[in-house]
Curated annotation (Swiss-Prot):
Keywords: Amino-acid biosynthesis, Isomerase, Methionine biosynthesis. PANTHER family: METHYLTHIORIBOSE-1-PHOSPHATE ISOMERASE. Pathway: Amino-acid biosynthesis; L-methionine biosynthesis via salvage pathway; L-methionine from S-methyl-5-thio-alpha-D-ribose 1-phosphate: step 1/6. Gene3D superfamilies: translation initiation factor eif-2b, domain 1, Translation initiation factor eif-2b, domain 2. The gene is mtnA. Pfam families: IF-2B. InterPro entries: IF-2B-related, IF-M1Pi, IF_2B-like_C, Initiation_fac_2B_a/b/d, M1Pi_N, NagB/RpiA_transferase-like. It is an enzyme of class 5 (isomerase). This is Methylthioribose-1-phosphate isomerase. The active site is at residue 240. It catalyses: 5-(methylsulfanyl)-alpha-D-ribose 1-phosphate = 5-(methylsulfanyl)-D-ribulose 1-phosphate. Belongs to the eIF-2B alpha/beta/delta subunits family. MtnA subfamily. It comes from Thioalkalivibrio sulfidiphilus (strain HL-EbGR7). The record marks 160 as: Transition state stabilizer. Substrate binds at residues 54-56, 96, 199, 250-251.
Length: 348
């Protein structure tokens, strides 16, 4: 670990002390910093669905600890642990359908449940801790790899929130940004608002301010003008699911940024751990896209902003075709100009 890793990494969204799970309620940022106690698996699933916690890696970590909480409520002499825990696994799996890390983490926990041995809750806790700790280590590795791709530039543009709030710590795309800023490869960050939940305004800007990294907020509609100005060298984003050919599902608006970046000659980077890559999904057409309540678009901060009687369409994610992506950065390495053959080679 380098000193810059600590200098620009102070935020944690998921806390586990061996007995209890606490989640930073991201719905209340930046006005309030409140950690919620998560007493059981039902509360963990609700926290994921209601976006107390969000970001694919953080969702997976939360789900893993949720399985631990579920196992601890069962008698030590439970005859069939998998049968007893299956409803809890299914409840967690149904909480957010697009984030593949959720299903990856649950599969790892299910594998432990299927192993013969004593004290299953303790073994599940050890596995959940490994998932959490490995995510942090992988993020720091991706930070180094992604920053190494960058020539010195005035700034980068990022979308949604991909930092410590969305992961086990440090971040995916924001991990690259943290590393690049620590190496003085960039001077500042532009973050777009990311409607309708305003993750860029509420979360990314807040997180970067906490860590002393200069950040300017923009409306999504300003992205094209920003790119045309020449101030941005890269667009750096995360991912909720990457298909076998490199097509990438991420927060709604990512696809538009990729189109704009290609038009303006700005390079486009996706940063995600290999747990986000779904080799069983051939391309982006097979990625399920969550649609959220229309009230999120028709209102803002709990107040109506649209004309009464207006409808809305509210997909939470979109799919960026692989041909618009210059690099996918993972903890295993970098795939430039991704396609199916390159993704297959990475995952071997």
């Amino acid at each position: 670990m380098k000193p810059t890793d600590l200098a620009f990494d102070t935020v944690r969204a998921v806390l586990w002390d061996g007995t209890s799970l606490k989640l930073l309620d991201q719905r209340r940022l930046p006005r309030e910093t409140v950690y919620l106690d998560i007493p059981d698996v039902g509360a963990a699933a609700d926290a994921i669905r209601e976006m107390v916690v969000r970001g694919a890696p953080a969702i997976g970590i939360t789900a893993a600890y949720g399985v631990v909480l579920a196992a601890r409520r069962l008698p030590a002499d439970t005859p069939d642990w998998l049968d007893a825990l299956t409803p809890d696994l299914e409840r967690l799996a149904a909480s957010r359908p697009t984030a593949v890390n959720l299903f990856w983490a649950l599969a790892r926990m299910k594998s432990v449940i299927g192993q013969v041995g004593a004290d299953l809750p303790a073994r599940l806790e050890a596995e959940a801790r490994r998932i959490h700790e490995d995510d942090l280590a992988d993020n720091r590795r991706m930070g180094e790899l992604g920053a190494a791709l960058m020539d010195p530039a005035e700034a980068v543009l990022t979308h949604c929130n991909t930092g410590s709030l969305a992961t086990g710590g440090y971040g995916t795309a924001l991990g690259v940004i943290r590393s690049a800023y620590g190496q003085q490869r960039i001077k500042k960050v532009y973050a777009d608002e990311t409607r309708p939940w305003l993750q860029g305004a509420r979360l990314t800007a807040w997180e970067l301010v906490q860590d002393g990294i200069p950040v300017d907020l923009i409306c999504e509609g300003a992205a094209a003008s920003l790119m045309r100005s020449g101030r941005v060298g890269w667009v750096v984003v995360g991912a909720d699911r990457i298909a076998a050919n490199g097509d990438t599902a991420n927060k709604i608006g990512t696809y538009a940024l990729a189109v704009l970046a290609r038009h303006h000659g700005v390079r486009f980077m996706v940063v995600a751990p290999t747990s986000t890559i779904d080799m069983d999904t051939p391309d982006g057409a097979g990625i399920p896209i969550e649609e959220r309540p229309v009230s999120e678009v028709l209102g803002l901060a709990g107040q109506p902003v649209a004309a009464e009687g207006a409808g809305a369409w509210n997909p939470a994610f979109d799919v960026t075709p692989a041909e618009l992506i210059d690099a996918i950065v993972t903890e295993k390495g970098v795939v430039e100009r991704p396609d199916r053959a390159k993704m297959t080679a990475l995952m071997k």
